[in-house]
């Protein structure tokens, strides 16, 4: 017999016998969370790579266009449904990227005009970013100042590897799309 756990409205973990396997990971504040490990695998040709959870299960697949200008990426969930489309907007003075989510919403990453260090901003994201977005070490907060996700870059890897912890699963698709877009922009900037 297996035990399952869930959180009741007060945030207390409730355990009950079940024939199905259900696993919740809790952060120190008692919130349910999902953790993903993302390894950068961008190349200039067509690419396809998986984003796995902390148990090694494939939750998302990223597929890049082949010989398409401007290059675009499509993110699929584990069932093969489109989660988002990432594309570079052509014919702009400074680089700008659009991320369209499957629910019809979209947000943008755009380069700001600066003289010393590259700076980017996210427009229409609906979340506040705290930390350094380009070093992949930041938190995303909602309008009530609740942390909905945390992204941290892991050191000592041959490729860019980062951990994505999502505390509110309703934001999973948006957070994964944002991270893939940031990684893509970072790859383009380092190759230019």
Report each predicted region and the residues it spans:
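Intrinsically disordered, low-complexity proline/glycine-rich segments
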Residues: 15, 22-192
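Intrinsically disordered, low-complexity segments enriched in serine/proline and basic residues
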Residues: 4-8, 15-22
């Amino acid at each position: 017999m297996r035990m399952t756990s869930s959180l009741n409205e007060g945030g207390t973990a409730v355990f009950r016998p079940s024939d199905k396997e259900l696993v919740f990971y809790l952060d120190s504040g008692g919130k349910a969370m999902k953790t993903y490990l993302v390894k950068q695998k961008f190349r200039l040709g067509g690419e396809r790579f998986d984003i796995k959870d902390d148990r090694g299960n494939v939750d998302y697949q990223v597929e890049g266009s082949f010989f398409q200008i401007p290059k675009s990426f499509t993110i699929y969930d584990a069932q093969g449904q489109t989660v988002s489309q990432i594309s570079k907007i052509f014919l702009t003075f400074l680089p700008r990227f659009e991320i369209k989510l499957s629910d019809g919403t979209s947000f943008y990453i755009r380069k700001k005009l600066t003289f010393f260090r590259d700076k980017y901003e996210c427009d229409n994201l609906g979340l506040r970013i705290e930390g350094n977005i380009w070093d992949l070490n930041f938190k995303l907060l909602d309008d009530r100042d609740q942390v909905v996700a945390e992204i941290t870059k892991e050191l000592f890897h041959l490729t860019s590897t980062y951990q994505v912890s999502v505390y509110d699963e309703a934001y999973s698709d948006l957070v994964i799309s944002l991270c893939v877009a940031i990684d893509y922009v970072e790859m383009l900037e380092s190759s230019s």
